[in-house]
Amino acid sequence: MDTPPVSGFSQHTPANGHRDASNDVPHAPACSPLDPVSDGLQAAAEAAMAQAKARVRARVRAARTALSPKVRAERDAAVVAAVTTLVQDRGWSRVAAYAPMAREPGGSLLVPALARLTTELWLPACRPGRMLRWGRYAGPGSVCAGMWGILEPRDAPQESDFLGSLDGVFVPAIAVDDQGFRLGQGAGFYDRALAGCAAPTVAVVYASEIMPVPHEPHDVMLDIIVSDG
């Protein structure tokens, strides 16, 4: 999938090629499920991976919580400016995004900005089985608090396989590395939703959240990163 060049202070294209083997961020090894020794190694590796992800999540959440209202507002405005530049530069008119939770980059500015910039804006709704369905945003009255307290579309008729027909998909992240590997909240909603997605996928983070992240084979690799610089 093609990606835009790095532009200005806020867009970042994940690096191509293989990761540096010297990186101390854990990777999930492949072990045979038929070998008891390998089973033990696999279990230990999975536990180490879970702990590594938990540490990164805790660190990023603490940093977000520590931001003053003034700094948060400035960073959110810069994030939305980066999103605006990307959408305009690429000529995107049909996109999917999300309503950020408290303290997530972009804040309350993200959805209104994308609604102004595009002709179609689709938002996710959480469903049982950790699945996402998608509904078209049609103003504040078209959304309500969902099962996790996040604003979701009242009507979400589309399954995630429709995302490939859009111009781009904006994705929340705790952190993302320079390869495009994303660390999410841990429930796996987006790993399922974006599997095989043909549309360009965009991580939305603060610049300090572009960092090495532990990842596993099922973790989604994103195409573009936007941040506050």
Name what the model sees in each region:
Residues 2-164:
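N-terminal active-site beta-alpha-beta segment that forms phosphate/nucleotide-binding
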Residues 5, 15, 19-21, 29-32, ...:
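Conserved phosphate- and dinucleotide-binding cores of soluble alpha/beta proteins
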